[in-house]
Amino acid sequence: MQAGVSEIFSSIQGEGKYVGCRQLFIRLIGCNMDCPYCDTDKLAHSNLVPCVLEKCEGYEGDLELKNPLDLNDIMPYINYRLQQPHHSISITGGEPLLYPQIILELAKNLKPLSIPLFLETNGTLVKQLAQVIDEIDIISMDMKLPSDIGKAYWQEHEEFLKLASKKDVYVKIVVSNESTVEDFEKALSIIKNIDENILLVLQPITPLGGLHEASPEKMLKWQTRAMQVLKNVRVIPQTHKMMNQL
């Protein structure tokens, strides 16, 4: 199966539970959503852009590949980069669960290396998660607030989290000035009803797409409220942007 891959690079995870960990990022093209604050929206719906492989010392293969491509086209580069230590491989996007077969093939190829697979997802494609969950080690699941994106995905999020809770999963909620308390309470209720021990990460929005930054007071108030319901709540911004990392 072919897929659109926009880039592969080694960098620091800047969000969520594993912030600061070194990962090899495989960014897939395509998404089933259109969030206004998306920072990869230019790559979300086009296979016309080439796949760019980060330049690294000693690698002699092509660093720009035509999309869509086969997994065999990028495995030599992935194997070369993994000669250096990495915490895990981040499969990100876009929405990587649009390509469950690619994820399964990747897991099969990487099994001899025993490196964890880290899935970054918008938490809506339940059937696709069911296809790959046995091969995934860590799940970073977004829970989208309707007040920010203009549409509710509560049923999808609930079903997704029930399945994902079998793994090392945490939920990330982007918080803007426009995010409503009603949406937040709904999200808390869903998480609590599945497992109050699931980590919730509140991520202050990096202003984009007409949404505005949440105040420090709002972030503290929302964390306080979440801690009354859940056992583990953290506020973590997009730290990679502070460090000028990809």
Residue ranges and their predicted role:
Residues 25-29, 46, 51, 55-58, ...:
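Solvent-exposed, non-transmembrane amphipathic alpha-helical segments
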Residues 13, 75-79, 192:
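Generic structural signal for well-ordered alpha-helical scaffold segments
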Residues 2-44, 48:
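N-terminal pre-triad scaffold of radical SAM enzymes
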Residues 3, 37-135:
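Conserved Radical SAM active-site core
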Residues 27, 92, 201:
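Conserved Rossmann-like nucleotide-binding pocket used by diverse enzymes
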Residues 85-88, 97-246:
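Conserved AdoMet/S-adenosylmethionine-binding subsite of the radical SAM
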Residues 21-25, 35, 41-43, 54-55, ...:
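General N-terminal targeting signals
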